[in-house]
Amino acid sequence: MASSSGPISPTSLEMFKPGVEELNPSKLLLLSNHQEGMLYPTILGSLELLSFKRERSLSLQKDKVCLLHQESQLLKLRGTGTDTTDVLLKQPMATSVNCCHDGIFTIWEQDRMLKTSTAPILTESTGSLATRLMSIPRLTLSIGTQVAMRLFRLGFRLARYSLRVTILKAQEGLLLIPDLLRAHPAEPLVQDRAVEPILAIEPPPLV
């Protein structure tokens, strides 16, 4: 049994409520200590502290495993006559991302992440964006033209009326393009090839 200065034994818990088996687990929890074989009374709230300590110890143990992994690879290289001076500098930065996933990066890793994130933006600004803008209307117009020709051959009056309304709305939008270009200037490539051919299109007759 435990002394008065040590941890509380199960028999001394009777002062809280008669019958240890009938204790409410939401008010009083008993955690087993495997080292001393005693029971410690723990109230709700201290469990979060214990879980925080457990997670912190696991993270420290994970860091130790990473360090041992790096040292073992260096020992393999040392016996082959390879110069490990450069490996000592590059290996911690290369394996830090694989071992530690807690959001801590080195300066070299942050620089590499910024370069990879800005790479698509640089390629878009060098001319591929204008090429993509030109390919999208061509594909859309080719599909729309095929559908319109099929509908006109079938002679559906309602379908032809819907197409006529769509074309009239498109022409109305073309009339507003000069005002939009003054507010938001576009590239000359998009202005010359996308606006002028559409102005020559006439709406199909409604039969």
Curated annotation (Swiss-Prot):
Q: Please name every pair of cysteines joined by a disulfide bond in this record.
A: none
Name the InterPro entries for this protein.
Corona_nucI, N2-like_embe-CoV
Effect of substituting A194V:
In strain: Isolate ATCC VR-759 and Isolate clinical OC43-Paris
Q: GO cellular component annotations, sorted alphabetically?
A: virion component
Q: What is the effect of changing P204L?
A: In strain: Isolate ATCC VR-759 and Isolate clinical OC43-Paris
Where it sits in the cell: the answer is: Virion
> Carries keyword RNA-binding?
no
One Pfam family recorded for the sequence: Corona_I
Q: Keywords in UniProt for this one?
A: Virion
Q: What is its main location?
A: virion
Miscellaneous comment text of the record = The gene encoding this protein is included within the N gene (alternative ORF).
Q: What does this protein do?
A: Structural protein that is not essential for the viral replication either in tissue culture or in its natural host.
Q: Member of which family?
A: Belongs to the coronavirus I protein family.
Q: What is this protein called?
A: Protein I
